């Protein structure tokens, strides 16, 4: 796991908040990444209209990453839509498919598609 001082980059865009997640998500950092995502969600409160998790730069993700996405979905509840951007040929997309998370969270090829869908 590569040490990153900031577990994710947060950008507020028109109509959504975009979080770019780290290059690797596994047991060593999944809790820290979730805490950062939850902090961004709570900081925006009722202003949060949609959340996009950008996994296009994530090269490695195990089942902890899938659990993170599912935990974020449950944190948001039905009020705030969650969308995920993941490269079609990347590991994160495959993990989301194999774990069944993709049935509950829409996955798009890139962040632009996720924002506009």
Residue ranges and their predicted role:
Residues 24, 88, 111-113:
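Short, solvent-exposed coil/turn elements at secondary-structure transition points
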Residues 16, 105-106:
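Short, conserved active-site loop motifs that form the nucleotide-linked donor/cofactor pocket
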Residues 27-105:
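Amphipathic alpha-helical interaction surfaces in cytosolic regulatory modules
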Residues 106-117:
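A charged, well-structured terminal subsegment
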Residues 2-38, 57:
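STAS-typified acidic loop motif
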